């Protein structure tokens, strides 16, 4: 299953939003008709399961969708008050957020129901597709701050326009708008470093399931070559293919 990193609020531009009760209901009803698969992320993003929209009840403002195959996961999901749905119908990144779910009966079986989201984000531009990098032997990002101090951080997600890195604590001097010159990293099996400058776009403090807190730092490539963009695209395609084979 393709794993696309969740977009931060700062990265979601208004022009990509589909808003209004009728347009939102119409779009999701289409996903239900085609049985488009989605992943639903909950528990502060620490848990997820695969689901399929089953029906939309516009008069009640409800979305009905499949339960997980795990009783324990379903119980934890029902305690979540913020859930993020991510899918790629027709190759287009689709994402929306809902509130808490409740269990309902649907066509003789159990299902979940949530209030329809206020809006849906649809991103078709290739530079907005981000993929989470493998957690085993992660990519390592190298950069330098203005004072010359070295940054060496594991990469959480990557696209042809930028990447996200994780840090146990926010490094001194790291803030949105700061430009990092002479950055580089190497893709697994590639053996050739990519060199570029990067602009920090956002920083976000997150909490793991264990309760430990860490930082996610989003960066934009400034001068990546077209050849390096192609190498990143191939890397993303390989990750998606391998994950699909394992699903």
From Swiss-Prot:
Cell compartment(s), UniProt: Bacterial flagellum basal body
Classification via InterPro entries: PilZ_domain, Split_barrel_FMN-bd, T3SS_YcgR, T3SS_YcgR_PilZN
Molecular-function GO terms, alphabetical: cyclic-di-GMP binding
Residue ranges of domain PilZ in the record: 124-237
Gene Ontology BP, a term: regulation of bacterial-type flagellum-dependent cell motility by regulation of motor speed
Record keywords: Bacterial flagellum, c-di-GMP, Nucleotide-binding
Domain of life: Bacteria
GO cellular component, one term: bacterial-type flagellum basal body
Family according to the record: Belongs to the YcgR family.
Subunit and interaction comment: Monomer. Interacts with the flagellar basal bodies.
Function: Acts as a flagellar brake, regulating swimming and swarming in a bis-(3'-5') cyclic diguanylic acid (c-di-GMP)-dependent manner. Binds 1 c-di-GMP dimer per subunit. Increasing levels of c-di-GMP lead to decreased motility.
HAMAP family: YcgR
The protein, known as: Flagellar brake protein YcgR 2
Organism, scientific name: Dechloromonas aromatica (strain RCB)
Native organism taxonomy: Bacteria, Pseudomonadati, Pseudomonadota, Betaproteobacteria, Rhodocyclales
Gene encoding the protein: ycgR2
């Amino acid at each position: 299953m393709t794993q696309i990193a969740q977009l931060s609020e700062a990265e979601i531009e208004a022009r990509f939003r589909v808003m209004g009760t009728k347009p939102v209901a119409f779009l999701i009803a289409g996903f239900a008709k085609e049985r488009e698969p989605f992943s639903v992320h909950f528990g502060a993003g620490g848990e997820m399961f695969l689901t399929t929209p089953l029906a939309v009840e516009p008069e009640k403002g409800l979305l009905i969708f499949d339960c997980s195959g795990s009783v324990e996961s379903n119980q934890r999901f029902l305690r979540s008050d913020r859930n993020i749905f991510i899918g790629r119908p027709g190759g287009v990144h689709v994402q929306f957020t809902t509130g808490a779910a409740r269990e309902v009966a649907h066509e003789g079986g159990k299902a979940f129901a949530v209030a329809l989201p206020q809006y849906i984000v649809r991103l078709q531009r290739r530079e907005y597709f981000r993929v989470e990098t493998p957690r085993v032997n992660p990519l390592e990002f190298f950069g330098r701050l203005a004072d010359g101090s070295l940054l060496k951080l594991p990469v959480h997600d990557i696209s042809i326009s930028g990447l996200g890195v994780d840090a146990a604590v926010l490094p001194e001097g790291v803030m949105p708008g700061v430009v990092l010159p002479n950055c580089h990293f190497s893709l697994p099996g590639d053996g050739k470093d990519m060199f570029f400058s990067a602009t920090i776009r956002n920083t976000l403090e997150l909490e793991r399931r264990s309760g430990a807190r860490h930082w996610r730092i989003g960066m934009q490539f400034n001068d990546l070559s077209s050849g390096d963009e192609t190498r990143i695209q191939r890397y993303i395609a390989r990750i998606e293919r391998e994950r699909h084979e394992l699903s």
